[in-house]
Amino acid sequence: MRAFSFRLEPILLLREGARKNALASYARSIIASKELEKKLDSLKKSLGDLQKDISKQRQKVFSPSTDVPNQAAIVNLKKKIDSTNHSIEEAKANENKLRLKFLDADNALKSVSRLKEKQESAHIEEQTSREELALEDVINSRFNFNSNIR
């Protein structure tokens, strides 16, 4: 039986590399999104802690001079939260874009892999039928040779 050789092997290797790169990019985007979500949770916790501290201070003594910096700190934290929310939205959009890119690369690889499998099975069937024909020819020639000798 002749060995099977896939002529599109370089394309298959390129598509495997493209899939790996797309998967790595997608994974990095997921990690970046998760880090931003952790940062957002931390900022929200800081805001809650600051608001609790301010309410404790107000229960003891309310002084407008101490309240102004507290309000500025709250506004600053809220701006950071809004900025982080915006960054998360961008990261999620990028993550979705990279997910689609990965799926495209995966589908391209799968199509070439299916083609390779199809060609390989066709090759095996062809080689098997050739071998069977060759065996039949050998058997028939022996039979004819033996028939002619008798």
Q: What are these regions, as identified by a protein language model?
A:
Residues M1-R150:
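Charge-rich amphipathic alpha-helical interaction elements
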